[in-house]
């Protein structure tokens, strides 16, 4: 029996699922009657999605499709940070959607403090973009996960729990 147990708290998304989502959106945009001639482009570049389209109406339709397909592929909608649409060349609109990944330092401190305040038998360490929660019993760690899940609704990022040992 190990002396202590631990798990990591991260904020991440499955990149392959996101690629599949973008592919499905492109396919639907090319097949839908109202969007077929809009000359809409979606590009996934590093940590952002770039949408080029003809009008505000088609932009809203494409964003709705992206959110719908992401939900069906079990991607949290909290990973999307929609920037303001801007005018692009040729009377077109461009919208950049930033993808949130990793725990920000202030969020990590807030989560760490809330766990420490409620559970005295658990140690929390901030490790870059993640939190390492360590405790002597699995029950304490499960309580820590419960505390974090309750707080997740108030956060602007999704939380995942990994490396449960």
From Swiss-Prot:
Transmembrane segments: none annotated. GO terms for cellular component: cytosol. SUPFAM superfamilies: YajQ-like. Keywords: Nucleotide-binding. It comes from the Bacteria. One of its GO terms (molecular function) is nucleotide binding. InterPro entries: DUF520, UPF0234-like_C, UPF0234_N, YajQ-like_sf. Belongs to the YajQ family. PANTHER family: UPF0234 PROTEIN YAJQ. Nucleotide-binding protein. This is Nucleotide-binding protein Pro_0479.
């Amino acid at each position: 029996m190990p002396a202590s147990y631990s798990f990591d708290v991260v904020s991440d998304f499955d990149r392959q699922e996101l690629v599949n989502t973008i592919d499905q959106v492109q396919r639907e945009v090319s097949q839908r009657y109202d969007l077929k001639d809009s000359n809409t482009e979606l590009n996934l570049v590093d940590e952002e999605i770039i949408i080029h389209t003809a009008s505000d109406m088609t932009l809203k339709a494409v964003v709705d499709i992206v959110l719908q397909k992401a939900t069906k592929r079990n991607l949290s909608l909290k990973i999307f940070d929609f920037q303001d649409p801007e005018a692009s060349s040729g009377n077109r609109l461009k919208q950049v959607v930033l993808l949130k990944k990793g725990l920000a330092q202030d969020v990590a401190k807030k989560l760490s403090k809330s766990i420490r305040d409620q559970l005295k038998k658990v140690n929390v360490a901030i490790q870059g973009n993640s939190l390492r929660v360590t405790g002597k019993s699995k029950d304490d760690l499960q309580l820590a996960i419960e505390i974090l899940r309750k707080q997740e609704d108030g956060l602007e990022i999704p939380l995942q729990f990994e490396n449960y040992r």
